[in-house]
């Protein structure tokens, strides 16, 4: 069970869902956060219940309430790569995420979510690096 204080905090600035008919709602962070919205808020961000994918087993807004193994930090990421390849990958990631965000990922300030991890992997493959990326650490975290 997720701490209620975390749900209250996240609910105020998170896209929530109110569709209790969705087959995934029992394990969806968005639905759980929606239950903890403060009454003082007049309006909130929520998913459109009329969207064709809403309330299906393939809901595009679904976020699991189970912690996932999330990498953090890329300080040692390039150690085994040739310098030319390192520069090419770094340039692609900065172009995609901005310099500030790239360095936040690199320092481990931001978790490397599954979609970011896929982008990093694709940048490595596009630049010719075939080994799996190595991150500084891995933590079990919720992916909001």
Identify what each model region corresponds to:
Residues 85-95, 102:
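Short alpha-helical "recognition helix" segments of helix-turn-helix
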Residues 115-133:
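DNA major-groove recognition helix of helix-turn-helix/homeodomain DNA-binding modules
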Residues 1-62:
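N-terminal cysteine/histidine-rich coordination modules
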Residues 98-112:
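Recognition helix of helix-turn-helix/homeodomain-like DNA-binding domains
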Residues 8-12, 69, 85, 97, ...:
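Alpha-helix N-cap/N′ positions at the starts of helices
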Residues 63-87, 130-135:
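A short, Lys/Arg-rich alpha-helix, primarily the initiator
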Residues 3-11, 135-144:
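Short, charged recognition helix plus adjacent turn
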Residues 18, 92, 110:
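Short, charged/polar micro-motifs that form catalytic or ligand-binding hotspots
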């Amino acid at each position: 069970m997720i701490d209620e204080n975390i749900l209250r905090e996240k609910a105020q600035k998170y896209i929530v869902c109110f569709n209790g008919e969705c087959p995934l709602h029992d394990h969806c962070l968005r639905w759980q956060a929606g239950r903890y919205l403060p009454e003082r808020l007049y309006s909130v961000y929520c998913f459109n219940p009329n969207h064709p994918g809403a309330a299906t087993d393939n809901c595009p807004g679904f976020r699991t309430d189970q912690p996932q193994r999330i990498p953090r930090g890329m300080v040692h990421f390039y150690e085994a790569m040739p310098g030319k390849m390192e520069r090419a990958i770094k340039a692609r990631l900065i172009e995609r995420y901005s310099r500030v965000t790239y360095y936040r990922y690199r320092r481990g300030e931001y978790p490397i979510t599954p979609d970011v991890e896929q982008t990093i992997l694709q940048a490595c493959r596009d630049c010719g690096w075939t080994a799996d990326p190595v991150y500084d650490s891995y933590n079990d975290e919720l992916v909001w």
